[in-house]
Amino acid sequence: MGRGRGKRVVRKLKLQIPGGQANPAPPVGPALGQAQVNIGEFVRQFNDATRDRMGQLIPVEITVYEDRSFTFVTKTPPAAFLLKQAAGVEKGSGEPNRSAAGRVSRAQVEEIARTKMPDLNAADVEAAVKIIEGTARSMGIKVEQ
């Protein structure tokens, strides 16, 4: 049996928006406006979908179709965002090898790895932990064993 043709994809957008706090102001409005998407509808749907992750930075992939309809997929927050939250710092170190920006425990790194598992290219949690530790190292955040 042949597969029916779906709607034609016109554009794919990737944005990072705080959970439950999307609004038509930049960067959301202009990006969606250029793609001719109903901005109000996206904002409402996104805020409903991310209400439980209020304040977290949520990467979202928006697929726009030729009839101006859209679908979106939310991802897990960036590892850097989760590490900064766990370490209680505003930003990573300007010179990661010289000065430490903060500290996180191995347990915190494992928790972040479990959260990020769906979006990481890792076979198991141990591999995911190594990826997160590498991100922490590049930000100047020390991982304590």
Curated annotation (Swiss-Prot):
Function statement: Forms part of the ribosomal stalk which helps the ribosome interact with GTP-bound translation factors.
Record keywords: Methylation, Ribonucleoprotein, Ribosomal protein, RNA-binding, rRNA-binding
Family: Belongs to the universal ribosomal protein uL11 family.
InterPro entries, per the entry: Ribosomal_uL11, Ribosomal_uL11_bac-typ, Ribosomal_uL11_C, Ribosomal_uL11_C_sf, Ribosomal_uL11_CS, Ribosomal_uL11_N, Ribosomal_uL11_N_sf
Subunit structure as annotated in this protein's UniProt entry: Part of the ribosomal stalk of the 50S ribosomal subunit. Interacts with L10 and the large rRNA to form the base of the stalk. L10 forms an elongated spine to which L12 dimers bind in a sequential fashion forming a multimeric L10(L12)X complex.
Gene source species: Rubrobacter xylanophilus (strain DSM 9941 / JCM 11954 / NBRC 16129 / PRD-1)
Record-linked SMART domains: RL11 (SM00649)
GO CC field: cytosolic large ribosomal subunit
Name of the protein this chain belongs to: Large ribosomal subunit protein uL11
GO MF, one annotated term: structural constituent of ribosome
Gene of this entry: rplK
Gene Ontology biological process terms from the UniProt entry: translation
